[in-house]
UniProtKB/Swiss-Prot annotation:
Keywords on record: Cell adhesion, Metal-binding, Nucleus, Repeat, Transcription, Transcription regulation, Zinc, Zinc-finger
PANTHER family tied to this protein: MIP31509P, REGULATORY PROTEIN ADR1
Protein name: Transcriptional regulator of yeast form adherence 4
Pfam families per record: zf-C2H2
Disordered as annotated region, ranges: 1-71, 146-260
Species of the source: Candida albicans (strain SC5314 / ATCC MYA-2876) (Yeast)
Compositional bias segments (type: Polar residues): 245-260
Length: 286
């Protein structure tokens, strides 16, 4: 016995495809909530940046205004008219105006020729990139000091040499004068000895300072040999070079000796003491 077969109804494909192909749309609440989040984040970032800028500007203006003090206690007296910044020293203000407002860069690196507005920036550049090379930084002031020191040392050495030369010349002059006085004294002693040995009165001395000059005139010798001494006047002029500051001056000494006419006696010249007395008298008279 067979069971009755019911007819199979065909499957509606259109409905299934339609259900599967329809996209799922997100709820309207989610769409509406996504936009305010992004806008709020961007607004927060903008406000934070603006607040930071305002804080830094206010802090810089408050810390560098006219009349404020540094941490060390120095007052900022010099005020910039362009940006209202104040400085403790005038050179700091001029450096600020030249580098910041005038855009001047007078300091250049000696190796890479990069210009800088301040010397400390050039020093930092040379230290970081060129291992602190002296070629990168100009040393004009230091070399000028060294040149000044060298010139001072040269001038000092020259003055010392001049002083030593002057002292040496003075010592030489003194030595020459001492030698001259010694030679004069020795020659005077020799003349006295010769006169005492000869037994004549042909010795005529002229005193000029510390030196003595002997005048042995032939007329006196002739008169003494004849036996009578007439009254005569003899004048002798001698020039003595005296060195005073390397200048020579001729000194003329005139001496007159009056010899009275008397008979020549041998008894008057026996003792050397009488001769010395007569010599001293003649020197005093002259």
């Amino acid at each position: 016995m067979s069971l009755p077969m019911s007819p199979v109804s065909p499957i509606n494909t259109t409905t299934s495809t339609s259900t599967t192909t329809t996209p799922l749309s997100p709820p309207s609440s989610i769409e509406n909530s996504s936009h305010p989040l992004s806008t709020s984040i961007s607004n927060n970032s903008i406000t934070s940046d603006s607040s930071l800028d305002s804080n830094t500007s206010t802090s810089s203006t408050t810390t560098t205004n006219y009349g404020t003090k540094t941490p060390s206690g120095n007052a900022r007296i010099f005020n910039c008219t362009l940006c209202q910044r104040a400085f403790t020293r005038e050179e700091h203000l001029t450096r600020h105006t030249l580098s910041t407002h005038n855009k001047l860069k007078p300091f250049t690196c000696g190796i890479c020729s990069r210009p800088f507005s301040r010397r400390d920036l050039l020093l930092r550049h040379a230290k970081n990139l060129h291992q602190g090379s002296e070629v990168a930084v100009s040393r004009i002031r230091k070399s000028y000091k060294h040149c000044n020191k060298d010139n001072d040392s040269k001038s000092g050495s020259d003055s010392n040499t001049n002083k030593t030369n002057k002292n040496g010349k003075k010592q030489e002059q003194e030595d020459d004068e001492e030698e001259g006085s010694r030679s004069d004294s020795s020659s005077g002693a020799d003349d006295e000895d010769s006169n005492t040995s000869s037994g004549g009165s042909n010795y005529h001395a002229i005193g000029s300072g510390n030196k003595r000059f002997v005048n042995n005139s032939p007329q006196l010798k002739k008169i003494l040999t004849n036996g009578s001494v007439p009254s005569t006047t003899t004048t002798s002029t001698t020039t003595v070079p005296t060195s005073t500051n390397n200048d020579t001056a001729s000194i003329t000494n005139s001496s007159t000796s009056h010899i009275h006419q008397r008979s020549l006696n041998v008894e008057d010249y026996d003792t050397p003491e009488k001769k010395r007395l007569k010599m001293s008298v003649n020197m005093l008279v002259s």
